[in-house]
C-alpha cells in the first residue's frame, strides 16, 4: 500500500486531531442529543412514526445484508448537525479518550475477559488470539483416546486408538446422544486412522489397520456386500462427478495407486497407477503430493511426471508426514522437521511445479496434524496443545495463539459440517449489536427504522465454524472472534490489518452476519485512510468508489461538508470517527478537487450500470454535477455532458446562457439538446458556428430523430454546404457520411450529384469515386481528370527523367531471364518516394481501365488519350502490356522490346523470318560474354524453329569466327544431328518411294501379262 507522507502546512489542521480519535464510545452525538427526548411517551412516538412515514421502510420488505435501505431526500442544511461549531464541540475527546492506545487496551481487556469466561468449567486453556473455544460435546467416554472426528448433518462420528467407532446424534440444538459404539473389527484393537465422508452418496470410508471399508450414512455401519480393501495406507478424494453422481477416490497401496469410483450403490476399481510405497497423500485432481520413504514427492498422474522434493525429517527419525491442501487449486502445505517431535519444524507451501512459495512458516514443534484455515495454520502438537500460526509471511510473530489441555493429546479436525456457536453471553452479544446497528448521520426521528436496523443485526448474528478441537474430555468448536471486536484501533497500522482481513473474506462465501461485519470493516478502512493519508484524492477516493455498493458514499460528502440529498446511515460504532473527521478540513488533503470529483463520478457511473448502487444514485450524482460544472466554468475548463445526469441539464443550460461564451460551450449544449430531444436547436448551433463536419456527423447520428419537413426541404442544402466547406483531409470522410445519409433519407444520389456546381471539379470527382461510376460519361470524366493530374505530376516532378533512369538500369542488365520491362517499372515505381503521387494516379487510371475492360470504346479512348502524353512507348507499356497488339504491329512491338533489351518479351514475337535478325542484334552487343549467353539462350529457347535446313545453315553462317564454339557446341551438335537426321530421313523416303514405284510397275506388268 502506498501512503503519501508530506509535511505541507495545509495538512496541519488535520494532523492536530488525528491521534485523538476513537472508534467506539458510550454514546454517539446523536444519542446524546436524543437523551433530551427520553421523557416522551409511547403515544407520541407512534404519532412521530406516522408523520415520518416517508422515511419508514415497508415492514414487509426483506432486509438484505448487502444493501442499504433508502430514505427520502433531506438536505444537510436542514439538520442541526450542520452547525460546524456544535459539531466540533461534540467531537472533542474526553480525558479517557486522549489517545487511541487506551481504546486498544480496553478492547484487549474485553477480549481476554471473554476468553477467561469461556475457560471457566472447560478442560481447555486458550491464550489471547483470533479464536475462542466453545464446547460442543463434553460427555465423551474419557477412557478412550480419539484419533479422528467428523460430522454429517446432525451426526458426529469419532474414531479411537482401540478401533472403536462412536456415533452421536443431535436430539436438539446442542444436545447430543450416543447412538452407537462399535468396533471396526471385533477381533482387533487397531486404531482408526481416518474417517473420510462422502456426503453426496451418503457414505464414508473408514481406514483402520490398512483396511478400507465403505460405511453408509447416517447409520454409520458397513455397507452390505461391499468389498473390503486391504493393504491401504491412505485414501483421499479426487473429485465428485455430477454426471455419474459418483466420487473418484485415490486409495494408496504398497503396490500402487488405486482409483476407485464410489456411487450410492457401488464401489468399483477403475484404474491403477504404478506408484508404489506411498504412505500419505493429498490430491488436486491428477496432481498428488505424497510422502514416500521419509521424503515428499509431487506426482502428476496424467503425465506420470514425478518431482522429488525434500525430506520429512533431517534424520531417520520416524516423523509422520504432514500433507494438506493450502488452497484447492494449485498449492499444497507440507512440513519438514528435525530429529524429533519436540524440535522445530517448517511449514512450506509448494505449488504444482514443486516450487516453494509464500516463504517459510516456522513452527515451534513438528506437528502431528495441520489444518489450513486461511489466513491461519492450525497445528496439532504432540504435547497436548494446539498452536495457531499466521499463514501470512509478513507477520512479525507467526505464532498467534495456543490451546492446551489437562487431558489426553488434543486433536484437530475440519469437518464437512458447519456449526453455529450459541454459547456467548448476552452482554457480549449486546456489545456487538450496538456496534453494528445503523444510525442516521443526518438528523432523523425515524425510530422505527433505527429499531429495525438493530433487529436486523440481532437476527443476522451468528458465529459459524467447521473447526473442531477434541480429546477424551470433550469436543469443542474453534470459533473465530467476531471481526468487529478484533479491529478497534484508529492507528495507521490498522489499515494494513483491515485490508488483509478483507482479502481473506473475499475468498470465502460469507454468512449474512459476516456480510455486515465486512461492511463495518470497509467503513472503518475508508475512515482510517481518509484520516491518515496526506493526499486522499487518488487511492482513497478510488477505494471509496470501490466500496460504494457496501458503504454509503454520501458519508464522505457529509464529512466534506457538501450538500447531501436524502438521509444517510452509518454504523453506530463508527459515528464518533465520522463526526470528528467532519470537524477536520478534509479539503486540505486534496490537491485537485475537480479531478477527485470527476474520478468519483466516473467510477460510480460504472458501478451503477451493474445495478450495485442504491436508489439514491441520482441524488449523489446531482450533488457532484452542479459542483463540477460551476468549478469548471470558473476555470474555463472543458465540460462534457457525460459528467452530468439528466436532472441537471436545465440548470446547466441556464448557467451557460448567463454568460456570453455560448459558442465555446457549443459541444456541451449540443449534447444536452440531444439528450432533451431538441435536435433542430443543436443543428442551428452547428450552422451558426460553421462547424459543418460536426453538422453532417450530427445529421448521420440523429437522422431518424429529425423532423420530416427538415429532411424534405433543408437536408440536401446542409449536406452540399458541408461538402463545399470541407478540405482534402476531411473530404473523403464527409462524402462517405453524405452518401450514407442520402441512403438513409432515400434521396436520389444522381440528383444530388447534379447539384454540385461545375466549377467544383475536384469535389465532383471525389463524390463519383465514393458513389461509384454510374455510366461511361462518369468513367471518361474521371479518366480525363486523373490523366490531367498525371500530366501535371510528370511535368512538376521530372518523372520522364526518373523513368529514363529506370529504363537505362533495365537495358544495362543483360540477364536473359530478367523480368519484363513493364513489371520492372512497376517495381521501381512502387519503391520510389519521388514517384508516389505518379503511382497514385496511375493506379486510379489503371483501376478505372480494368473496371471498363469490356467497353471497347472506353479502352480505345484511354489509349488515344495516353498516347498523346506518352514518350518512347513507356506509358502505353505500363497501361497496356498485353493489349498493345490491338494498336501496334508485331514488327513494331519487336523493335520496341529490342530497344529496351526485354529479351523475354522479344520471344513472343520471334519466328523463322526474324530469328536470324534478332540473333545478329544480340551478337552486336559489345561484350562477347553477354552476346554468347544471349545467343545461346535465344537458340535453346527457340530450338523448335531450327527444323528447316535453310535456317540451320543461316544460323551456322551467322556465328562469327571469333565466337567460342565450345560454349554452344552442344547446341551446334543438336543442330547438325537434326540436319543429318533430316537428310537421312529424306534419302530413306526417296529409297522407299523408288521401291514402291518399282513394285507397282512389276505388279502392273504381271497384271497385263495375265490379261
UniProtKB/Swiss-Prot annotation:
Compartments, as annotated in UniProt: Cytoplasm
GO biological process, one term: vacuole inheritance
Ranges of residues in domain CNH: 143-418
Keyword list, A-Z: Cytoplasm
GO CC terms in record: CORVET complex; cytoplasm; early endosome membrane; endosome; fungal-type vacuole membrane
Compositional bias (Polar residues): 87-100
Organism in which the protein naturally occurs: Saccharomyces cerevisiae (strain ATCC 204508 / S288c)
Name assigned to this protein: Vacuolar protein sorting-associated protein 3
Domain of life, per lineage: Eukaryota
Disordered: region residues: 1-100
InterPro entries from the UniProt entry: CNH_dom, Vam6/VPS39/TRAP1
The keyword Cytoplasm is annotated on this UniProt entry: yes
Amino acid at each position: 500500500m502506498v501512503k503519501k507522507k508530506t509535511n505541507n502546512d495545509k495538512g496541519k489542521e488535520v494532523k492536530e486531531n488525528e491521534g485523538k480519535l476513537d472508534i467506539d464510545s458510550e454514546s454517539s452525538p446523536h444519542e446524546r442529543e436524543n437523551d433530551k427526548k427520553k421523557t416522551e411517551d409511547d403515544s407520541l412516538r407512534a404519532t412521530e412514526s406516522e408523520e415520518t412515514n416517508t422515511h419508514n421502510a415497508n415492514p414487509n420488505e426483506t432486509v438484505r445484508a448487502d444493501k442499504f435501505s433508502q430514505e427520502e431526500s433531506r438536505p444537510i442544511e436542514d439538520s442541526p448537525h450542520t452547525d460546524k461549531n456544535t459539531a466540533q464541540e461534540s467531537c472533542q475527546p474526553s480525558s479517557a479518550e486522549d489517545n487511541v492506545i487506551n481504546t486498544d487496551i480496553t478492547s484487549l481487556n474485553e477480549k481476554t475477559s471473554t476468553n477467561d469466561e469461556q475457560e471457566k468449567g472447560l478442560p481447555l486453556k486458550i491464550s489471547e488470539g483470533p479464536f475462542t473455544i466453545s464446547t460442543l460435546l463434553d460427555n465423551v467416554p474419557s477412557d478412550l483416546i480419539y484419533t479422528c472426528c467428523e460430522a454429517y448433518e446432525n451426526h458426529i462420528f469419532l474414531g479411537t486408538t482401540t478401533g472403536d467407532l462412536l456415533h452421536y446424534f443431535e436430539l436438539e440444538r446442542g444436545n447430543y446422544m450416543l447412538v452407537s459404539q462399535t468396533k471396526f473389527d471385533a477381533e482387533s484393537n487397531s486404531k482408526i486412522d481416518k474417517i473420510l465422508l462422502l456426503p453426496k452418496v451418503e457414505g464414508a470410508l473408514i481406514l483402520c489397520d490398512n483396511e478400507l471399508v465403505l460405511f453408509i450414512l447416517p447409520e454409520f455401519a458397513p455397507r452390505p456386500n461391499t468389498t473390503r480393501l486391504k493393504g491401504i495406507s491412505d485414501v483421499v478424494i479426487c473429485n465428485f462427478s455430477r454426471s455419474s453422481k459418483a466420487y473418484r477416490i485415490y486409495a494408496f497401496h504398497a503396490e500402487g495407486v488405486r482409483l476407485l469410483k464410489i456411487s450410492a450403490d457401488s464401489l468399483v476399481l477403475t484404474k491403477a497407477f504404478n506408484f508404489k510405497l506411498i504412505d500419505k497423500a493429498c490430491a488436486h485432481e491428477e496432481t498428488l503430493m505424497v510422502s514416500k520413504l521419509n521424503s515428499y514427492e509431487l506426482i502428476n498422474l496424467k503425465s506420470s511426471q514425478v518431482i522429488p522434493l525434500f525430506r520429512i525429517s533431517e534424520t531417520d527419525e520416524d516423523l509422520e508426514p504432514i500433507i494438506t491442501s493450502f488452497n484447492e487449486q494449485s498449492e499444497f502445505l507440507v512440513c519438514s522437521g528435525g530429529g524429533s517431535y519436540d524440535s522445530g519444524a517448517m511449514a512450506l507451501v509448494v505449488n504444482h511445479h514443486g516450487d516453494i512459495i509464500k516463504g517459510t512458516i516456522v513452527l515451534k514443534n513438528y506437528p502431528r496434524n495441520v489444518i489450513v484455515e486461511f489466513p491461519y495454520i492450525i497445528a496439532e502438537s504432540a504435547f497436548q496443545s494446539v498452536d495457531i500460526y499466521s499463514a501470512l509471511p509478513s507477520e512479525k510473530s507467526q505464532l498467534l495463539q495456543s490451546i492446551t489441555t489437562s487431558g489426553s493429546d488434543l486433536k484437530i479436525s475440519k469437518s464437512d459440517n458447519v456449526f453455529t456457536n450459541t454459547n456467548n453471553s448476552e452482554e457480549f452479544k449486546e456489545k456487538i449489536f450496538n456496534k453494528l446497528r445503523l444510525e442516521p448521520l443526518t438528523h432523523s426521528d425515524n425510530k422505527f427504522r433505527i429499531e429495525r436496523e438493530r433487529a436486523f443485526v440481532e437476527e443476522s448474528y451468528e458465529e459459524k465454524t467447521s473447526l473442531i478441537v477434541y480429546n477424551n474430555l470433550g469436543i469443542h468448536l474453534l470459533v473465530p472472534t467476531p471481526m468487529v471486536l478484533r479491529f478497534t484501533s484508529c492507528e495507521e497500522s490498522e489499515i494494513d490489518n483491515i485490508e488483509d482481513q478483507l482479502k481473506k473474506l473475499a475468498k470465502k462465501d460469507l454468512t449474512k452476519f459476516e456480510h455486515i461485519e465486512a461492511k463495518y470493516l470497509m467503513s472503518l478502512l475508508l475512515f482510517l485512510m481518509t484520516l491518515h493519508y496526506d493526499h486522499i484524492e487518488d487511492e482513497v477516493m478510488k477505494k471509496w468508489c470501490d466500496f460504494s455498493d457496501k458503504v454509503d458514499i454520501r458519508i464522505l460528502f457529509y464529512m466534506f461538508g457538501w450538500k447531501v440529498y436524502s438521509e444517510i446511515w452509518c454504523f453506530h460504532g463508527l459515528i464518533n470517527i465520522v463526526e470528528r473527521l467532519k470537524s477536520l478540513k478534509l479539503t486540505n488533503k486534496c490537491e485537485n478537487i475537480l479531478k477527485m470529483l470527476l474520478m468519483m463520478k466516473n467510477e460510480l457511473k460504472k458501478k451503477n450500470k451493474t445495478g450495485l448502487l442504491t436508489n439514491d444514485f441520482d441524488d449523489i450524482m446531482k450533488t457532484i454535477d452542479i459542483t463540477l460544472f460551476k468549478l469548471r466554468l470558473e476555470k474555463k475548463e472543458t465540460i462534457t455532458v457525460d459528467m452530468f445526469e439528466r436532472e441537471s441539464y436545465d440548470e446547466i443550460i441556464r448557467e451557460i446562457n448567463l454568460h456570453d461564451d455560448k459558442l465555446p460551450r457549443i459541444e456541451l449544449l449540443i449534447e444536452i439538446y440531444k439528450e432533451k430531444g431538441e435536435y433542430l436547436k443543436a443543428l442551428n448551433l452547428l450552422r451558426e458556428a460553421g462547424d459543418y463536419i460536426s453538422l453532417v456527423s450530427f445529421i448521420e447520428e440523429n437522422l431518424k430523430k429529425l423532423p420530416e419537413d427538415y429532411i424534405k426541404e433543408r437536408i440536401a442544402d446542409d449536406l452540399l454546404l458541408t461538402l463545399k466547406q470541407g478540405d482534402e483531409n476531411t473530404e473523403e470522410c464527409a462524402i462517405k457520411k453524405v452518401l450514407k445519409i442520402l441512403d438513409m433519407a432515400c434521396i436520389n444520389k444522381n440528383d444530388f450529384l447534379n447539384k454540385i456546381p461545375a466549377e467544383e471539379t475536384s469535389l465532383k470527382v471525389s463524390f463519383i469515386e465514393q458513389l461509384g461510376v454510374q455510366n461511361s460519361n462518369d468513367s471518361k470524366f474521371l479518366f480525363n481528370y486523373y490523366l490531367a493530374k498525371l500530366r501535371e505530376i510528370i511535368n512538376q516532378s521530372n518523372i520522364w527523367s526518373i523513368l529514363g533512369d529506370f529504363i537505362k538500369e533495365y537495358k544495362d542488365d543483360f540477364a536473359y531471364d530478367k523480368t519484363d520491362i513493364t513489371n520492372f517499372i512497376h517495381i521501381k515505381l512502387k519503391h520510389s518516394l519521388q514517384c508516389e503521387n505518379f503511382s497514385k494516379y496511375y493506379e486510379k487510371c489503371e483501376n478505372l481501365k480494368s473496371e471498363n475492360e469490356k467497353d471497347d470504346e472506353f479502352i480505345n479512348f484511354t489509349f488515344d488519350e495516353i498516347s498523346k502524353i506518352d514518350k518512347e512507348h513507356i506509358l502505353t507499356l505500363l497501361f497496356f502490356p498485353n493489349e498493345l497488339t490491338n494498336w501496334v504491329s508485331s514488327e513494331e512491338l519487336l523493335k520496341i522490346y529490342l530497344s529496351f533489351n526485354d529479351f523475354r518479351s522479344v520471344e513472343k514475337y520471334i519466328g523463322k523470318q526474324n530469328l536470324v535478325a534478332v540473333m545478329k542484334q544480340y551478337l552486336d552487343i559489345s561484350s562477347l560474354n553477354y552476346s554468347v549467353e544471349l545467343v545461346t539462350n535465344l537458340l535453346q529457347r527457340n530450338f523448335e524453329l531450327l527444323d528447316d535446313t535453310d535456317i540451320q545453315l543461316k544460323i551456322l553462317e551467322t556465328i562469327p569466327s571469333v565466337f567460342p564454339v565450345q560454349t554452344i557446341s552442344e547446341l551446334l551438335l543438336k543442330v547438325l544431328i537434326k540436319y543429318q537426321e533430316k537428310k537421312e530421313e529424306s534419302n530413306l523416303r526417296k529409297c522407299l518411294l523408288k521401291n514402291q514405284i518399282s513394285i507397282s510397275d512389276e505388279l502392273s506388268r504381271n497384271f497385263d501379262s495375265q490379261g
